[in-house]
């Protein structure tokens, strides 16, 4: 829906460590409407990534939401059942992770990585999913997507891995896309290209 609103309400997250409890996020609130671009700014270690991972329900096992909530259209997404979470994160909210080499399974080909989510969440035939996957790779200005689909992440450069990860996220047609420092490990020229590609895709898809 056009009037979707994703809210983080007074979020407080802590991690249990060998040195005791560490306050990772304290009293963070924000509101994101669909079709708008927002930047979360802060020093290294200030909780930007933890806030993103909390929205995605991907906190590490030693992390805990002490108080606050994350809601989509006023419905808490931190208290959903396993099935509801899979539907939400497959269809509504996607994420581009900071380190593509860690986020992409090295045992899978690019084709397998792209098709897995499309077939699982959108119930497409293999042929339909493959067409969407190829189009997503073309949108990221990746050369020879047919050949690229046969490769595994370790055979690709950092910039190509990052583009593949964005293509995977975009192929799912999410309403919201969270990008956690998506260009950190890349050179300045590639950084600019990828940020521009994300921006153009967000305008085209009303993310």
What are these regions (language model features)?
Residues 77-94, 120:
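ABC ATPase NBD coupling module
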Residues 2-5, 14-27, 58-64, 81-84, ...:
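A short, flexible loop at the N-terminus of ABC-type nucleotide-binding domains that lies
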Residues 128-147, 199:
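Conserved ABC ATPase "signature" region
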Residues 151-156, 160:
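Conserved ABC ATPase signature
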Residues 41-42:
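The feature captures the beta-strand-to-loop junction immediately N-terminal to the Walker
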Residues 171-175:
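A short, proline-enriched helix->beta-strand linker immediately N-terminal to the Walker B motif
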Residues 65-76:
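Conserved ABC transporter NBD signature motif
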